[in-house]
Amino acid sequence: MIKLCVFDFDATLMDGETIDILATAHGKGNQISEITRYAMAGELDFFESLQKRVSFLKGMSYKKVLELGSTLPLMHGAHELIQYLKSKNIQIVIFSGGFHEGIDPAMQKLGINLGFANYLHHKNDILTGLIGGEIMFSNSKGLMLQRLKSFLNLKTDEVMCVGDGANDLAMFNESGLKIAFCAKEILRSQADICIDIKDLKEIIKVI
């Protein structure tokens, strides 16, 4: 019986990539979106690509970041899936290689209480181009899930996870039910279930 569901955020619970949205607003969209694409396909080191992408945001207004973060579009079916999981008493957590500035408003909207992500460093309301946080490496989600399972006294087969990119592989390895949602091939090959319709309600049919 599933007791915990771990979600990726960008391109999973949220319809898009937070860093690409921020970069576009900062006039750096083309530079960052290509790096994001290669990183999520597993063709670049996640830590190095994250640092490089965030460096392009240097000079951006932090107030603007918060404004954009509060209006990120949720994936179709997100509300319905979260409500379904809650009705089954399944605990929900977000693991994001993105930013708290994006996931925190979404957590409020969806009624999710726990999320792990990174923080955009800023000084005098201006991004410095630096980043820190809990999910900065390709293995971060796996290590975080190990700790969470231990803390909650859960077995691997009591955990499901939903993701789309290469940095979700590590949490797949710690999960009993692995769901690839509109995912890159590197993740699809390791999944128990692949959902190719861009609607999170499809997951309700298979769990």
From Swiss-Prot:
Mg(2+) binds at residues 8, 10, 164. GO terms for biological process: L-serine biosynthetic process. Pathway: Amino-acid biosynthesis; L-serine biosynthesis; L-serine from 3-phospho-D-glycerate: step 3/3. One of its GO terms (molecular function) is L-phosphoserine phosphatase activity. Substrate binds at residues 17, 53, 96-97, 141, 167. The active site is at residues 8, 10. CDD domains: HAD_PSP. InterPro entries: HAD-like_SerB, HAD-like_sf, HAD_sf, PSP. SUPFAM superfamilies: HAD-like. It catalyses: O-phospho-L-serine + H2O = L-serine + phosphate; O-phospho-D-serine + H2O = D-serine + phosphate. Its EC number is 3.1.3.3. Keywords: Amino-acid biosynthesis, Hydrolase, Magnesium, Metal-binding, Serine biosynthesis. Its cofactor is Mg(2+). Pfam families: Hydrolase (PF00702). GO terms for cellular component: cytoplasm. Belongs to the HAD-like hydrolase superfamily. SerB family. PANTHER family: PHOSPHOSERINE PHOSPHATASE. This is Phosphoserine phosphatase. It comes from Campylobacter jejuni subsp. doylei (strain ATCC BAA-1458 / RM4099 / 269.97). The gene is serB.
